[in-house]
Amino acid sequence: MALGARRVAGVDEVGRGPLAGPVTAAAVVLDPANIPEGLNDSKQLSVKRRNLLGDALASSADISVGHASVEEIEQHNILRASHMAMLRALAGLRLRPDFVLIDGAMVPQGLNLRAQPVVKGDTRCLSISAASIIAKIARDKIMVDLAQQHPGYGWETNMGYGSKSHISALRNLGVTPHHRRTFKPVHHMLYQDKNVKP
C-alpha cells in the first residue's frame, strides 16, 4: 500500500450521521518512533482514554483538523462535505505526506496525493485510528460549545445525533441554524410548519 512512503497520513471523519453540527475530519502523520499505545477507533474508547490519547498525539504527531459546515452539507451532500473536510485536514498538515490512508471505500475527488481507501480503517490502521480520535475530540468540543448557545437539545451528550431527547427537543423548541435541513427528521419538522429558532 504505502511501500516506500516516509510520511504516511491517516485520515478519518466524524459526524456524517448527526442531525446537527459540522462534519469534521482529521489527518495524522504518526512519528514511527513515538506511537502512543492503545490507538483504536475513537468509538471504542472511553472519553477519558480518548482525551489522553489526543494529548499524546498532539505532542508526538503531525495533526490537522478540517470541517465542512452545515451550509456545505446542505449545498453539496454529506459525502461530498466529508471529503471537503478531509481535503482541508490534509492541507493543514505541517509537511505534505507521501501517501494517504483514508477510512472508507473512496478517495476524495481532488486529492493530488497517492492514496488508498481502507474499509474499516479506523480499526485496521494506526494512523487512521489516530485521525478518528483527533476528529472526534475536535467535533465533540464544537458540539459542547453549541450546546451552551442552544440549551435543551442535549448536544453536549448526543453530539447532534438523533437521540430520542434530541428529536423531542426538535418538536418542542424548533429547528436551529445548526440543524441539517435536508436530513429526514429535521426536514419533516420543517414540513410540519415548526418555527425555526433564530
From Swiss-Prot:
InterPro entries xref list: RNase_HII, RNase_HII/HIII, RNase_HII/HIII_dom, RNaseH-like_sf, RNaseH_sf
Superkingdom of this protein's organism: Bacteria
Cross-referenced SUPFAM superfamilies: Ribonuclease H-like
Subcellular location: Cytoplasm
Cofactors demanded by this protein: Mn(2+); Mg(2+)
Cofactor remark from the record: Manganese or magnesium. Binds 1 divalent metal ion per monomer in the absence of substrate. May bind a second metal ion after substrate binding.
EC annotation from Swiss-Prot or TrEMBL: 3.1.26.4
Family: Belongs to the RNase HII family.
Name of the molecule in the record: Ribonuclease HII
Species whose genome carries this gene: Roseobacter denitrificans (strain ATCC 33942 / OCh 114) (Erythrobacter sp. (strain OCh 114))
Upper lineage: Bacteria, Pseudomonadati, Pseudomonadota, Alphaproteobacteria, Rhodobacterales
